[in-house]
């Protein structure tokens, strides 16, 4: 060892801890560029560790020595190595400062990692085991900490792992709390590498869990926040380690940790740790939780926690806020039977409480649960609305705000159902927006925003004058960017609902919004500007391209400037604005592509790690690794740095999601002029399909399918015909793009673990097949059928079980039959049925052989207790009948029996779908079912006298129309038609207009007396469908119906004259 070098190195280490920034910078540079690059620096550092009197320098020397061990230890002479090993153990035992002892312990572990595999330092284990039994607490603590460091650092075989488990199982009961906690950490390190195939090791490990729980309860009871965090970190490790470790103990673990979360005697910071564990448990062990039927006790406990006060800072964790987050996740990951229904029962009781905190918790629980249980919420709206209305009228401000938040969330998730109650809800919310303080007023404005978006043009018209006067007034006179943002968003929703009825308010609104585009250069200003860009897009869509044209170029330039600003939210809103303008201007948007598409590419190309270092001055990837390894440094600061890193990554990921989605939208609406950008767009999007964030994957895949479908359309391929091989030639370029999209789609599906992504993939596949026909399938028809069958059998990887639980013992496996489906599960299966339907449409009669395989799997869902699944099964079989047409004949008797039973189902949606499907079966099957028509009519009769389901009446009319078209002689037309005509026009399911008006046209050509005598009273119906929304009729049917009306118009001139729009059409 060079004495002079060691002296200089010591001086530099002293300089590194000086209070002078300049000295620190100079010392760090010298250490990195010169001194620590010398092989002899390791020996000098060991010397400084043992001799320096300053504990900070000793600690720093140990940190640097640990980093250098793997570089220089092998070059040290064997005799010197032995001397260092002995001396290192000695100085570690004698070190008085615990943080320095830990640093020394890490050095011992680093050397052990190098020595033990080579059969060196064999005496270390015996020394440490002996030290764990020493009378001196500090020696035991040191020994266990070194053992923990070795367990964390060294690759141990199963025999050594078992020795460590057995040793920690003894030290976990030590009289020293520090020893006990460190023992738990050591066991946590072992859990990360433990594999379940060694049963002896697994059972020994499981035997330590009760002891670990006792340590957790102890540190929680004494309020030791740091120790609690260390132990909770270990329990969090269990959730992503071998599933077999805690599978048998999970119920007991949840019970204890839930108790901690719910105890007001426990420090809030520790309770937040417990709730964070519950959140992770829901994410990673949802099927196990469901199999253990823990959903109900969990949600009830969490609702109790939700009654507590929340902190003012919405970004700050507190027990109540985390409890609501947990309820949100529970509703998504567990079935409604275990979460929503127990939660709603408790919410009903809470809402009657004299304590405002309970009434507030009831409303907030309903609000957070709706995203994962929207179908269940929709089915219970008659019982939910009274709770919300009472909340809106509550005398407590916090309860009123909670009611607004709940109503907003429900309106976002199920807008159609909520919009039916606008007359009851909107006046209450208007009043709160006008008369309450800023806090409630802001929530009321957000609620208005959500409610308006669900209204149609006719529903909003009565509110528009008063609403726009109030909103524009608030926008012009409020000084608060936050309030302005809420108001601007509400204006956007009003425009979205009003469509061209918004034109009278257009100029004043644009003038007011324009002022908000020149805001302060801070987060609030950028947020406001982003929201205004969203609103301007909604207005452009409402008023149309001609009215918006004077503003277009300037706003596109402003949006482009927004993209250059370092603010993800503003960039996202600019991307959305471009996508909306593409929808409005279509091919006329082409001149702007040369600037906009590269900007979208730039966003997608962002490297999260580069941006991380650039934006927050964060360390490099290697330095982050060192931060994670260096537990002897300030862990709290490290956590903050990593949180900042994750925050930046999340913001960039969400920006990429929006950019990917905007590319697909722009491609779809601009069409042919986008073709020069198509190839690089596909390349960028394909790269995004492997992104870590599911939102990016989903947007990228959706946009890829839109790009492929759009290219098919712009190539003007003749209308496809059902069947494979292709009957209509398709250019190779079209085949190639579909092949590329299919490949990354199947690659993603092979390892996708997010149900929402898998669901979206199958929906896009189905839509593309229906639009573009069999060319979409290429050579992958069998592969697609395999994926769909896996999903229908609940055997796809995304349905296979909890994340990380691929190595349970056989008795621990949770089968799909043991748990009810979540609504997310049901959506995935529904999307698989969509693909089956699409294949039937694209392949026609040739799909019949495949349908023989699919049919039993689909019909199994009709046996489900879940009404939605029964409805799905009936609709799927009916749609397939419509796709394969006469090829349904061999299935007729089975399918007919299914539909007849479904027409009497307890659920209205099932009966509605059965009516639709029965019509298709009777229309296309070549087996004569006319003898059953009267039985079918009998089962349809209640549809005309009762409220069965939203679409039930329309489906019944469609069914009857098909029966008449197929064999009118089997129907008492003179009795049936007056009833059908009295219920027109159709209001809910416009698809049924096709059989209805084909039937009317057919009877008219025959001059059927029953039809002819009702033609006069049908004029208002014809006026409604011919002058109403275009989606009511396809072009061909519209033309035929218009011709018929022109023929009969002279006979009914006095009636026709009451409908000016119809008169204009007839001229």
Curated annotation (Swiss-Prot):
**GO cellular component annotations, sorted alphabetically?**
cytoplasm; cytosol; nuclear envelope; nuclear periphery; nucleus
> Might you name a Gene Ontology BP term for this protein?
protein import into nucleus
**Stored Pfam families:** HEAT_EZ, IBN_N
Main location class: cytoplasm
Q: Note the InterPro entries from the entry.
A: ARM-like, ARM-type_fold, HEAT_type_2, Importin-beta_N, Importin_beta
> Has keyword Nucleus?
yes
> Where is this chain's protein located in or outside the cell?
Cytoplasm; Nucleus; Nucleus envelope
Which keywords does this Swiss-Prot/TrEMBL entry list? Cytoplasm, Nucleus, Protein transport, Repeat, Transport
Respond yes or no to whether keyword Nuclease is given for this record: no
Importin N-terminal domain: residues covered: 27-94
Q: Which SMART domains match?
A: IBN_N (SM00913)
Q: List the disulfide bonds.
A: none
Which sections of the protein are HEAT repeats?
A: 159-196, 379-416, 420-457, 591-633, 890-927, 1013-1050
Q: Which GO terms describe its molecular function?
A: nuclear import signal receptor activity; nuclear localization sequence binding; small GTPase binding
PANTHER family in alphabetical order: IMPORTIN BETA
The function of this protein is: Required for nuclear protein import, its predominant substrate seems to be ribosomal proteins. Binds to nucleoporins and the GTP-bound form of gsp1 (Ran).
* Family statement: Belongs to the importin beta family.
Protein name, please? Probable importin subunit beta-4
Naturally occurring in which organism (per UniProt): Schizosaccharomyces pombe (strain 972 / ATCC 24843) (Fission yeast)
Taxonomy, top ranks, is: Eukaryota, Fungi, Dikarya, Ascomycota, Taphrinomycotina
């Amino acid at each position: 060892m060079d004495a002079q070098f060691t002296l200089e190195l010591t001086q530099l280490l002293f300089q590194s801890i000086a209070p002078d920034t300049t000295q620190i910078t100079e010392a760090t540079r010298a250490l990195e560029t010169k001194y620590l690059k010398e092989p002899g620096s390791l020996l000098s550092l060991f010397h400084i560790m043992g001799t320096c009197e300053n504990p900070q320098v000793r600690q720093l020397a140990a940190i640097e020595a640990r980093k250098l061990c793997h570089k220089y230890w092998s070059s040290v002479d064997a005799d010197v190595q032995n001397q260092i090993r002995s001396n290192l153990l000695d100085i570690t035992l004698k070190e008085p400062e615990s943080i320095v002892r830990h640093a020394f312990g890490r050095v011992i572990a680093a050397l052990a990692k190098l020595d033990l595999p080579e059969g060196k330092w064999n005496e270390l284990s015996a020394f440490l085991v002996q030290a764990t039994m020493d009378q001196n607490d500090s020696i035991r603590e040191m020994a266990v900490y070194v053992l923990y460091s070795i367990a964390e650092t060294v690759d141990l075989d199963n025999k050594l792992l078992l020795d460590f488990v057995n040793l920690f199982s003894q030290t976990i009961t030590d009289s020293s709390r520090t020893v006990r906690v460190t023992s738990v950490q050591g066991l946590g390190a072992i859990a990360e590498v433990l594999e379940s195939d060694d049963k002896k090791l697994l059972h020994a490990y499981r035997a330590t869990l009760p002891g670990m729980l006792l340590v957790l309860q102890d540190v929680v009871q004494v309020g030791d926040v740091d120790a609690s965090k260390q132990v909770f970190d270990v329990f969090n490790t269990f959730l992503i380690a071998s599933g077999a470790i805690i599978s048998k103990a999970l119920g007991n673990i949840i019970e204890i940790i839930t108790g901690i979360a719910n105890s007001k005697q426990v420090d809030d910071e520790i309770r937040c740790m417990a709730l964070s564990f519950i959140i992770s448990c829901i994410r990673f062990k949802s099927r196990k939780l469901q199999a253990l039927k823990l959903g109900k006790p969990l949600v009830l406990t969490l609702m109790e926690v939700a009654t507590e006060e929340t902190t003012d800072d919405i970004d700050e964790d507190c027990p109540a806020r985390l409890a609501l987050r947990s309820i949100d996740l529970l509703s998504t990951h567990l079935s409604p039977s275990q979460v929503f229904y127990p939660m709603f029962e408790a919410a009903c009781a809470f809402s009657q409480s004299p304590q405002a905190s309970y009434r507030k918790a009831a409303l907030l629980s309903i609000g957070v649960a709706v995203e994962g249980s929207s179908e269940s919420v929709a089915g219970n709206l008659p019982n939910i609305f009274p709770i919300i209305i009472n909340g809106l009228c509550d005398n407590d401000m916090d309860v009123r705000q909670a009611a607004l938040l709940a109503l907003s969330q429900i309106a976002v998730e199920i807008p159609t159902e909520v919009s039916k109650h606008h007359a009851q809800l909107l006046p209450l919310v208007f009043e709160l927006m006008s008369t309450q303080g800023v806090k409630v007023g802001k929530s009321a404005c957000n609620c208005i925003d959500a409610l308006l978006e669900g209204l149609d043009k006719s529903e909003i018209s009565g509110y528009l004058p008063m609403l726009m006067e109030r909103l524009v007034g608030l926008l012009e006179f409020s000084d608060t960017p936050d309030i302005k943002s809420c108001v601007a968003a509400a204006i956007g929703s009003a425009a979205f609902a009003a469509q061209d009825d918004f034109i009278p308010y257009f100029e004043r609104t644009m003038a007011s919004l324009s002022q908000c585009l020149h805001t302060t250069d801070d987060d609030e200003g950028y947020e406001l500007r982003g929201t205004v860009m969203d609103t301007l897009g909604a207005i452009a869509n409402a008023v149309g391209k001609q009215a918006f044209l004077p503003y277009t170029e300037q706003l596109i330039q402003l949006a482009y400037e927004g993209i250059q600003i370092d603010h993800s939210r503003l960039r996202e809103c600019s991307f959305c604005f471009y996508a909306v303008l593409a929808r409005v201007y279509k091919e006329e948007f082409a001149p702007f592509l040369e600037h906009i598409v590269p900007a979208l590419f730039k966003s997608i190309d962002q490297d999260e790690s580069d941006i991380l270092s650039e934006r927050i001055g964060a360390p490099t990837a290697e330095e982050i690794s060192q931060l994670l390894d260096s537990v002897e440094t300030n862990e709290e600061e490290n956590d903050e740095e990593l949180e900042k890193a994750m925050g930046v990554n999340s913001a960039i990921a969400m920006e990429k999601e929006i950019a990917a989605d905007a590319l697909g939208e722009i491609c779809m609406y601009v069409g042919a002029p986008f073709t020069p950008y198509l190839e690089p767009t596909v390349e960028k999007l394909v790269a995004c399909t492997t992104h870590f964030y599911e939102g990016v994957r989903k947007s990228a895949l959706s946009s890829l399918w839109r790009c492929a479908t759009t290219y098919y359309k712009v190539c003007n391929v003749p209308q496809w015909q059902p069947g494979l091989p292709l009957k209509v030639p398709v250019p190779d370029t079209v085949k190639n793009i579909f092949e590329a999209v299919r490949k990354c789609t199947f690659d993603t599906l092979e390892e996708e673990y997010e149900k929402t992504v898998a669901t979206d993939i199958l929906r896009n596949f189905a839509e593309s097949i229906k639009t573009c026909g069999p060319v979409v399938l290429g050579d992958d028809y069998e592969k697609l059928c395999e994926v769909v069958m896996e999903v229908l059998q609940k055997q796809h990887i995304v349905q296979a079980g909890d994340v990380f639980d691929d190595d349970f013992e056989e008795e621990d496996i949770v089968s799909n039959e043991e748990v009810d489906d979540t609504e997310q599960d049901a959506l995935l299966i529904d999307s698989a049925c969509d693909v089956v339907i699409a294949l039937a449409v694209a392949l026609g009669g040739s799909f019949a052989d495949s349908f023989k395989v699919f049919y039993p799997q689909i019909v199994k869902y009709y046996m489900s207790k879940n009404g939605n699944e029964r409805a799905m099964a009936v609709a799927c079989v009916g749609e397939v009948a419509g796709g394969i047409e006469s090829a349904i004949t061999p299935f007729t008797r089975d399918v007919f029996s299914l539909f007849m039973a479904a027409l009497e189902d307890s659920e209205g949606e099932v009966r509605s779908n059965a009516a639709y499907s029965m019509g298709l079966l009777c229309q296309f099957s070549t087996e004569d079912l006319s003898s059953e028509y009267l039985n079918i009519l009998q089962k349809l009769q209640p549809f005309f006298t009762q409220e069965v389901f939203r679409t039930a009446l329309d489906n019944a009319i469609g069914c009857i129309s098909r029966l008449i078209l197929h064999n009118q002689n089997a129907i008492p037309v003179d009795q049936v038609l007056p009833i059908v005509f009295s219920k027109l026009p159709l209001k809910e399911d416009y698809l049924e207009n096709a059989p209805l008006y084909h039937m009317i046209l057919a009877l008219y050509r025959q001059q059927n007396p029953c039809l002819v005598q009702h033609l006069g009273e049908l004029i208002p119906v014809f006026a409604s469908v011919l002058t109403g929304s275009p989606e009511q009729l396809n072009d061909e049917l519209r033309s035929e119906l218009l011709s018929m009306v022109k023929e009969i118009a002279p006979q009914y001139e006095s009636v026709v004259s009451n409908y000016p729009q119809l008169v204009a059409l007839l001229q």
